[in-house]
């Protein structure tokens, strides 16, 4: 009841939940995410919480640690030398940024009607959000302007960014699989290689390390991998020098 009252006052769900529960830990975005992970855990799994050391979420470097947000900001600003102490190896590449696809994303948003917005994951149809998003997209002259026009206490910046990106990538709630049809390995350490060998024998799902291994997938798994590959090609446009597909 207190949660519903907070939402009725225009608070975002995390803020309304914190006010209803009176829990200081729910003031942190990462702690809110942790609560959702705990809710999703199947019976029999036990969670282990580990205190965060050093930099806070989106905060400056502290205690020998830097947040991912801080590191991305340094790299995008061309200040790689300041980021290097917090990285496993010196940075020598380009940093991706949605600023490079601002017009492309906005072009997609301007073509969308309320039904298109409602079809997105977390599109907020029950809250009346699609009408606000469609109206904001038609009048905004940049992505930041779109976020500023659409933002309210209930619809925070982070949610709007996710919706804009989902729209650009063509994601739809109805097409989201209920469970992951395969495991995609993006990187691993020496210990990870040992675990990978064991996974190939014990994992209930196909394990994909190299794109060529996706040829063995079929049905929904193959369709999802192909969709993932197409969206990765779009990510290549986020670099200062656009990268080719593949």
Predicted regions and their residues:
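Active-site cores that bind ATP or allylic diphosphates and position pyrophosphate for catalysis
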Residues: 1-246
């Amino acid at each position: 009841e207190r949660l519903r009252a907070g939402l009725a006052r225009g608070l975002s769900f995390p803020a309304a939940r914190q006010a209803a529960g009176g829990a200081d830990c729910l003031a942190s975005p990462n702690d809110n995410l942790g609560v959702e992970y705990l809710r999703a855990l199947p019976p029999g799994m036990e969670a282990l919480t580990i205190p965060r050391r050093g930099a806070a979420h989106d905060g400056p470097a502290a205690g020998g640690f830097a947040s991912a947000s801080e590191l991305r900001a340094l790299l995008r600003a061309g200040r790689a030398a300041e980021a290097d102490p917090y990285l496993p190896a010196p940075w020598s590449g380009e940093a991706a940024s949605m600023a490079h696809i601002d017009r492309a994303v906005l072009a997609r948003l301007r073509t969308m009607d309320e039904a298109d917005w409602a079809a997105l994951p977390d599109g907020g149809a029950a809250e009346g959000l699609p009408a606000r998003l469609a109206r904001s997209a038609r009048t905004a002259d940049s992505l930041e302007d779109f976020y500023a026009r659409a933002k309210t206490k209930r619809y925070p910046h982070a949610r709007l960014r996710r919706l804009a990106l989902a729209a650009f990538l063509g994601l739809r709630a109805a097409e989201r699989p209920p469970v992951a049809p395969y495991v995609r390995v993006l990187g691993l350490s020496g210990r990870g290689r040992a675990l990978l060998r064991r996974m190939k024998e014990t994992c209930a799902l196909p394990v994909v390390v190299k794109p060529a291994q996706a040829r063995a997938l079929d049905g929904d798994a193959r369709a999802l991998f192909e969709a993932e590959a197409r969206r990765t090609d779009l990510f290549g446009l986020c670099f200062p020098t656009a990268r080719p597909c593949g």
